From Swiss-Prot:
This is ATP synthase subunit beta. The lineage of its organism: Bacteria, Pseudomonadati, Pseudomonadota, Gammaproteobacteria, Lysobacterales. PANTHER family: ATP SYNTHASE, ATP SYNTHASE SUBUNIT BETA, MITOCHONDRIAL. GO terms for molecular function: ATP binding; ATP hydrolysis activity; proton-transporting ATP synthase activity, rotational mechanism. Produces ATP from ADP in the presence of a proton gradient across the membrane. The catalytic sites are hosted primarily by the beta subunits. Coiled coil: none annotated. Its main location: membrane. It comes from Xanthomonas campestris pv. campestris (strain ATCC 33913 / DSM 3586 / NCPPB 528 / LMG 568 / P 25).
Amino acid sequence: MSQGKIVQIIGAVVDVEFQRNEVPKVYHALKVEGTAITLEVQQQLGDGVVRTIALGSTDGLKRNLLATNTERAISVPVGAGTLGRIMDVLGRPIDEAGDVQASDHWEIHRAAPSYEDQSSSTELLETGIKVIDLMCPFAKGGKVGLFGGAGVGKTVNMMELINNIAKAHSGLSVFAGVGERTREGNDFYHEMKDSNVLDKVAMVYGQMNEPPGNRLRVALTGLTMAEYFRDEKDENGKGKDVLLFVDNIYRYTLAGTEVSALLGRMPSAVGYQPTLAEEMGVLQERITSTKSGSITSIQAVYVPADDLTDPSPATTFAHLDSTVTLSRNIASLGIYPAVDPLDSTSRQMDPLVIGHEHYDTAQRVQQTLQKYKELKDIIAILGMDELSEEDKQSVSRARKIERFFSQPFHVAEVFTGSPGKYVSLKDTIRGFKAICDGEYDHLPEQAFYMVGSIEEAVEKANKMSAKA
């Protein structure tokens, strides 16, 4: 193993000089002697000097310290030993529960599965959240993005999906916390512990307070652990079905921007790194399903200033099967989850995949909401009285649909005081079809707010009329 010495330190960037015939390769990990710091080689500058990014604080580093080349990329523990544990970007435990007992270590930089090994699935994944199941259904083994600005409920939606899918799903889950709040990571750990599914979840965190190198690589660490579960075959030659949760993919891009600037690259549009599309592709192309096992990934995507055309969310869109767009306007009406049914999409929205009844109901709901959206300007200027009877009926049904899309969440029980509701896909389709058919035109729209199935709305309406 070759050794070099540190010649320059600028923030998180460390230059190390080696003998010219022993220069480490790009992405090789270097260990700094006498410290716990790992450096990752990013560039070869010539004359034996390599430029590296520190994975950890550079406090206490000084020139002439020795750095040893490990001659391989960062390797992290994989396998059953990671379940129930919280680890950092290097796979070191941060939950004070002793060492991670792993039989194997995998490098975090890996090639994506070849085209012939990949498989696509059209099997639906039921989430129990009405608006998602109806308007932008998820595919098993697909990629889902939760898009939203600050404070519209990305993390709460993700926690509810974890609650509904990970608990019902008998397989394994990996949670990668990329540049998010430490408190949320802590809440997630206790949530999993209280619901007795901690032994099926591996958690990897590189939170907001950590250097950019950690935040850039932690998504790859979590993905590597998920890939192991997918690819490790049992006695029947089958891998596992894994759920991968990433919160937040925007922070991965942001860390890439910071690293790019530190390395002195020219910025591109809006100050992002010139390699934005490639960096996103390197991560997303590996999140895929193969013939032996599947990775279903749910990623939260922060939208800066609510601008979906920003290069970061715009680049992410291309890689996803379903997009769930959270809207500030809907949140301001008090409708949660604040999913915009007209802006959310899914590749599964095809009658041959989801069935004609589901497809037709979703289309009718969309048409009713679109008509209401177009009539809003007229209503604002002239009022409801100027509308035709048919338009009044459409507006009334659209407002009921909007309210029926709201739903109490299990993870928000502590705040709202109302118990969470899981609504099956069959009940969801039946409820919305009945509203579109006008079966509930006689009920007040308030009855549809924050209920589960359509029967609960009828029951709520009866209670309201009894009180009146």
